[in-house]
């Protein structure tokens, strides 16, 4: 589902900073992945690229067989809404909703009926135990 091949990212400025150097990664549908590393090692940059929030300089990124490069904002938002989810180390839940409602919220925006989204949210919460 997610395929990265030889991904490079450099932040240009007074001193160029080459933060991703030849990253290769494959993530299957439904697979849970943890990205860990020291401060400044490129984790946030990698997540921004995976989440289609930032572009890469070199390499190939495909999501469900579609090349992720130069997408319109509308198409990128559609991919993020339907295909990508993150759980951050320090995350913020919507305080007036319980855990199940927080997990189900993206499904609401996708138009999934309430019973189905609640069942899916509970299923995924059970996987976290």
Where are these regions (language model features)?
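ABC ATPase NBD coupling module
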Residues: 17, 68-85
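The feature captures the beta-strand-to-loop junction immediately N-terminal to the Walker
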Residues: 36-38
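Helix-to-loop junction immediately C-terminal to a conserved catalytic motif
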Residues: 51
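ABC nucleotide-binding domain "signature motif"
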Residues: 57-67
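Conserved ABC ATPase "signature" region
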Residues: 66-67, 108, 115-129
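Short coil-to-helix segment of the ABC ATPase nucleotide-binding domain corresponding to the Q-loop/switch region
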Residues: 97-106
């Amino acid at each position: 589902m997610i395929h990265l091949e030889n991904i490079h990212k450099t932040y240009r400025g007074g001193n160029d900073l080459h933060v991703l150097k030849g990253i290769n990664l494959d993530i299957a549908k439904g697979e849970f992945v943890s990205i860990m590393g020291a401060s400044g090692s490129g984790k946030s940059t990698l997540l921004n690229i995976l989440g289609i929030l930032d572009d890469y300089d070199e390499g190939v990124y495909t999501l469900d067989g579609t090349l992720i490069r130069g997408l319109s904002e509308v198409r990128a938002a559609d991919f993020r809404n339907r295909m990508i989810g993150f759980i951050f180390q320090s995350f913020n839940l919507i305080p007036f909703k319980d855990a199940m409602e927080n997990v189900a919220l993206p499904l609401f925006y996708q138009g999934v009926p309430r019973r189905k989204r609640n069942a899916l949210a509970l299923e995924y919460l059970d996987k976290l135990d």
